[in-house]
Swiss-Prot record:
Name the UniProt record assigns to this protein: Mitochondrial inner membrane magnesium transporter MRS2
Chief localization: mitochondrion
Subcellular location: Mitochondrion inner membrane
Organism, scientific name: Candida albicans (strain SC5314 / ATCC MYA-2876)
Membrane topology annotation: Multi-pass membrane protein
Transmembrane segments: 327-347, 365-385
A GO biological-process term: mitochondrial magnesium ion transmembrane transport
GO MF term (any one): cardiolipin binding
Keyword Lyase found: no
Keywords: Ion transport, Magnesium, Membrane, Mitochondrion, Mitochondrion inner membrane, Transit peptide, Transmembrane, Transmembrane helix, Transport
């Protein structure tokens, strides 16, 4: 019954005020209930039963109707467009255009203040500006508003994707202002409604990022795919943008909490003078601290997710580098084998020339050419694999085993079995991996430093630490 009286209240009083929840389906805002429409013969004959029948479906779709009615406007250099709410939450003006100079004079603002909150297609850094005993200027995400002690003006947007969010905010703002005050100032209720809308969208966005990025990271753990990496890059850019916006909003709230003069200026209904000795701003501090902690939580979650993405990217890069090196090594091995076989076929090619060489008359010519060709091919293959194996080694100082032995790194290598030692000493192992191994004799000998050299090195180390 309460909803019926609430719906019929503007009709009975023919008031100029209206509510977002009371709007009919043809329009959300912009039209008042005029007496000629209310007093028509068809509307008078409407029964209470039909109202009750349609009220349930209307209440469920009230918010969806708001989403489809607000439309973006075109920025104008001469006018500002905004929607106004009075002290009890009723809408007094809908998308009303004010001349900028007149608007500045009526609200006691400067032109530089209007640049922060004016409707524009350019995103401005989030800000909450305080005009003591006059107004609070708010620009947070999709909301640009001016809060006074008995009035709230919400600026219209020029972006179609923001119009939906702004419609939901106006609906929530109206309900918040119409609810019981509970000894909370009007300006604080309006500001809290803005902060609730901002933190709600931050929470929804960080949940979406965590869900989408979490799925991609889990898939990359199983398989490194090009499409997944590209999608992760796109998500990472969006997450970085969200992280930056959340940091800016958190910094705005932190600056307000640290400035007692601004806290005192936010009391518009009950004016307070700034007195450094008396810091009694518990009401506004509790509101700002609550939403500051929420913003800080979203910043930490976004930063943690960015760290996970960065760690995953580094691991993927290491895997890709290892695969790339393996492919290059495989290609080099094929090249070495090809070179060995090519050199092995060189002598038979000479032997097969249609010229007299007096070898074909002997019984051992074929065997000699075959043995020489094989030895030549194996020798070339062995030399190339030996050089390739030296290139593969990564040591602290140089590529030789002697430097590794000199640094003492080989002491930490676990001992191998006799079978492994025999394999490393075999002809095939030396052929394909070179003669340089753990158990081979060092090709160079390094003398131990003398005591004088040790003292000089110690002084150099200490001097370097002092300089750092």
């Amino acid at each position: 019954m309460y909803h019926i009286h609430r719906l019929l209240a503007p009709i009975r009083s023919n008031s100029v005020f209206f509510s977002l929840a009371q709007l009919p389906k043809p329009s959300l805002i912009g039209c008042r209930y005029k007496s000629n429409n209310v007093g028509s013969q068809d509307s008078k004959r409407t029964s209470k039963n039909s109202i009750l029948h349609n009220l349930g479906s209307y209440s469920n779709s009230a918010e969806s109707e708001i989403l489809n009615k607000l439309k973006p406007i075109t920025p104008n250099d001469l006018y500002v467009s905004c929607t106004s709410f009075d002290r009890i939450g009723n809408i007094t003006a809908v998308s009303r255009k004010y001349p900028k100079m007149q608007f500045l004079k009526e609200n006691h603002l400067f032109p530089r203040d209007l640049r922060k909150i004016d409707t524009s297609s350019i995103d401005v850094v989030p800000v909450i500006m305080i005009r003591p005993s006059s107004a609070i200027l708010v620009n947070l995400l999709h909301i640009k508003a001016i809060i006074k002690k008995d009035n709230v003006m919400v600026f219209d947007t020029s972006k179609s994707e923001v119009a939906t969010k702004l419609g939901i905010f106006m609906y929530d703002l109206e309900l918040k202002l119409k609810s019981p005050a509970n000894n909370v100032c009007y300006e604080f209720r309006a500001l809290e409604s803005i902060l609730v809308s901002v933190t709600s969208y931050l929470e929804a966005e960080i949940k979406l990022h965590r869900q989408q990025c979490g799925i991609i990271l889990a898939e990359l753990e199983d398989e490194v795919d090009r499409a997944k990496l590209q999608e992760l890059l796109i998500r990472s850019k969006k997450l970085s943008s969200f992280h930056q916006r959340a940091i800016l909003i958190r910094d705005v709230l932190e600056e307000l909490l640290e400035n007692d003069e601004d806290l005192a200026g936010m009391y518009l209904t009950d004016l307070k003078r700034f007195e450094p000795e008396e810091e009694n701003y518990e009401e506004i501090e509790s509101i700002l601290e609550s939403y500051y902690n929420q913003c800080d939580e979203y910043v930490q979650q976004a930063g943690s997710l960015l760290s996970d993405i960065k760690a995953t990217e580094e691991i993927v890069n290491i895997i890709l580098d290892a695969n790339r090196n393996s492919l290059m090594l495989f290609e080099l091995k094929i090249t070495v084998y090809t070179l060995g076989f090519t050199v092995a076929t060189l002598v038979p090619a000479f032997y097969g020339m249609n010229l007299k060489n007096y070898i074909e008359e002997t019984n051992w010519g074929f065997g000699l050419v075959l043995v020489v060709s094989l030895l030549q091919g194996l020798a070339i293959t062995w030399l190339n694999f030996r050089k390739l194996h030296k290139v593969q080694k990564l040591t602290m100082m140089g590529t030789s085993n002697s430097s590794k032995a000199g640094t003492g790194l080989s002491r930490h290598i676990p001992p191998t079995s006799r079978v492994d030692r025999w394999k490393r000493g075999s002809f095939l192992y030396r052929l394909f991996y070179g003669s340089g191994g753990k158990y081979s004799k060092p090709s160079k000998k390094f003398d131990r430093p003398t005591n004088r050299e040790k003292d000089a090195m110690w002084r150099m180390i200490n001097d370097d630490k002092a300089m750092k």
